[in-house]
């Protein structure tokens, strides 16, 4: 089953008339392109935006919360009702159903749980929770040797703290964190 996100994540957008026309057309194009796939179970408005907008992490203008609600709780449902009314729509992930109502509530909707990776908790921490639906969680790993061989042929560069490995790591301190957990 496919949980299909619209391509919005980790940011806020100013909803100008031009931007609205642009995203409406993008929604229509993608809905028409994907709606007939038998595995499509759900459309999701965005990734992690409801949670961070509610927390005030990204909001810099008072209109951004209004624009958020308009985009994900009015425009997308409106377009879906015309082009794919039979596929379920979820406004964000994580969410408890929208309107900034406790977006990461473990008892309603879906949850993103990153306390092991970002919070340096032990793996046993996962056993403490019984989320209704954990749609995102995880722990980073080192790439396979086969993948690493596409960027270096020097065996010394396969060390997690080598120049090549550090330059390909996109999470500050990530290689050290992985090594610590491996001890």
Where on the chain are the PLM-derived regions?
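Active-site-adjacent substrate/metal-binding segments within catalytic domains
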Residues: 1-10, 20-42, 169-183
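Aromatic-lined substrate-binding rim segments of carbohydrate-active enzymes
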Residues: 1-20, 86, 102-124
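Hydrophobic faces of well-ordered beta-strands that scaffold small-molecule active sites
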Residues: 2-5, 45, 90-91, 133-135
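Active-site neighborhood of glycoside hydrolase catalytic domains
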Residues: 13-104
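Short, low-complexity, polar/charged sequence segments that are solvent-exposed and flexible
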Residues: 22-23, 61-65, 108-111, 134, ...
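Substrate-binding clefts and catalytic carboxylate motifs of secreted carbohydrate-active enzymes
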Residues: 78-81, 97-100, 115-183
